[in-house]
Amino acid sequence: MAELATIARPYAEALFQSAKPAELAGCLEQLNELAQLAALPEVAALSNNPKVSADDLSKLLSGMVKTKLDGKVASFLNLINQNHRLAAVPEIAHQFEAMKNKSEGAAEVSITSAFPLEGSALNDLLSSLKKRFGGKELRPTIQVDPTLIGGVRIQVGDEVMDSSVKAQLAQMQASLGA
């Protein structure tokens, strides 16, 4: 995984630096579509087939996306295919999104709860998280995982806060076993 991140970083940085601030959202949307395609086993098999040229693969993928690729992303896709780096596109999209969020003073927050969070409970949680992270705009992704038993698990960047019952039970088990 670290190797893929290392491969992806220069590509993500190059695309990010070439895009104007107004183009970032569109580039990210197109990158995410390409990432979904790159993750398909059939597309991976095509990209590894020596009989399929980089140009043909780029044309095929450009035709498969819902959104027409703009010039920067189309050139980027061609470069990726010429360098046989299609497998890195999901990680490139992830890093591009992180760069976009950083430039906008925002952060992705992943909230996993044992039960659905709605209304005031969700708003209160987001409000306290916003204070904790210096007033950054938070872009939440909310998931429900009943195996947590109770509580929430929150991840912002590389920081994880886990107040779930499952985590507390694991801590107790570890301390009793020691």
Curated annotation (Swiss-Prot):
One of its GO terms (molecular function) is proton-transporting ATP synthase activity, rotational mechanism. Its main location: membrane. InterPro entries: ATP_synth_OSCP/delta_N_sf, ATPase_OSCP/dsu. It holds the Pfam family OSCP. It is a peripheral membrane protein. One of its GO terms (cellular component) is plasma membrane. This is ATP synthase subunit delta. It comes from Polynucleobacter asymbioticus (strain DSM 18221 / CIP 109841 / QLW-P1DMWA-1).
